Curated annotation (Swiss-Prot):
InterPro entries: A/AMP_deam_AS (IPR006650), A_deaminase (IPR028893), A_deaminase_dom (IPR001365), Ado/ade_deaminase (IPR006330), Metal_Hydrolase (IPR032466). It comes from the Bacteria. Substrate binds at H14, D16, G170, D279. This is Adenosine deaminase. Its EC number is 3.5.4.4. It comes from Salmonella typhimurium (strain LT2 / SGSC1412 / ATCC 700720). One of its GO terms (biological process) is inosine biosynthetic process.
Length: 333
């Protein structure tokens, strides 16, 4: 179902949600950190979703073991590098990796700005090694509150030339976007793009707020947009993209089943929706699974899957010339 004549992208992919189980095991041993299991086989149920979680917050607890072993900046650098290696193995030509430096720093009180620098270094080395093109999106973890998000923002702005966009993720219901208006004003002043997790746990009003108040150019997940036809019209007319993550939305119980997922409706409505993974290591999936298994199960036709692939590059945070160069590179391969 993947069109090999087109660039394959993943523009909603959490770097700190894609820490390999083997790496968790390795780092746990290296830093003498107690893990819930001592072999790869027995560790996987603790760090990977093996059945549907009751809600988003329950799903997010699966991520915690990955960051609990980040006891040094070198460990952060390693997982960033491995993220690019994984992208290359999946056949991705372009990936946007998003990460919350405060979340990665938290368990071992690492310097947040140091985490940002380590991630930048690891991704740069990975791109040079594996030939994948990547951009970084900084996340503010809303669950930690406004002050903690300000610390994350300051650390990201210290490396602003290496960061492409700002995102807001975490507990959407408990920490609405209205708490972070000044944060996003600073991000836009820095020339960054804006994407926001919205309409995943909260309703369409959260998406409207992300667009009108935070300046979102893309929406992460955005499944609740299907409940508001005027919103879908607006998204299509204004070319505001939706970063769809099919398997993730089932695993978090955001959507009951793939057959119920609104991605097909979005595409029929002319919304620029794309296919993405979200947290591949935690979910136990890759981008190939999303195209070959999840998308058909969600009712997408072959042409709709191709359109979602086209949309992935169309709404990527790249210039028109960069998109054109990527298309030409793939066409000539």
């Amino acid at each position: 179902m993947i069109d090999i004549t087109l660039p394959l992208t993943d523009i909603h992919r959490h770097l700190d949600g894609n820490i390999r189980a083997q790496t968790i095991l390795d780092l746990g041993r290296q830093f003498n950190i107690a893990l819930p299991a001592q072999t790869l086989e027995t560790l996987i149920p603790h760090v990977q979703v093996t059945s549907t979680e009751p809600d988003l917050v329950s799903f997010l607890t699966k991520l915690d073991w990955g960051v609990k072993v980040l006891a040094s900046l070198d460990a952060c650098r390693r997982v960033a590098f491995e993220n690019i290696e994984d992208a290359a193995r999946n056949g991705l030509h372009y990936v946007e990796l998003r990460f919350s430096p405060g979340y990665m720093a938290m368990a071992h009180q690492l310097p947040i700005a140091g985490v940002v620098e380590a991630v930048i270094d690891g991704v740069r080395d990975g791109c040079n090694t594996f030939g994948v093109e990547a951009r970084l999106i900084g996340i503010m973890s809303r669950t930690f509150g406004e002050a903690a998000c300000l610390q994350e923002l300051d650390a990201l702005l210290a490396h602003r030339e290496n960061i492409t966009a700002l995102d807001l993720a975490g507990d959407e219901l408990g920490f609405p976007g209205s708490l972070f208006l000044s944060h996003f004003n600073r991000a836009r002043d820095a020339g960054w793009h804006i994407t926001v997790h919205a309409g995943e746990a909260a309703g369409p009003e959260s998406i409207w707020q992300a667009i009108r108040e935070l300046g979102a150019e893309r929406i992460g997940h955005g499944v609740k947009a299907v409940e508001d036809r005027a919103l879908m019209d607006f998204l299509a007319q204004q070319r505001i993209g939706i970063e769809s993550c099919l398997t993730s939305n089932i695993q978090t119980s955001t959507v009951a089943s793939l057959a119920d997922h609104p991605l097909k409706t979005f595409l029929e409505h002319g919304v620029l929706a794309s296919l993405n993974t979200d947290d591949p290591a935690v979910q136990g999936v890759d981008i190939i699974h999303e195209y070959h298994v999840a998308a058909p199960a969600a009712g997408l036709s072959r042409e709709q899957i191709r359109q979602a692939q086209i949309n992935g590059l169309e709404i990527a945070f790249l210039s028109d010339s960069e998109k054109r160069a990527l298309r030409e590179k793939v066409a000539e391969a």
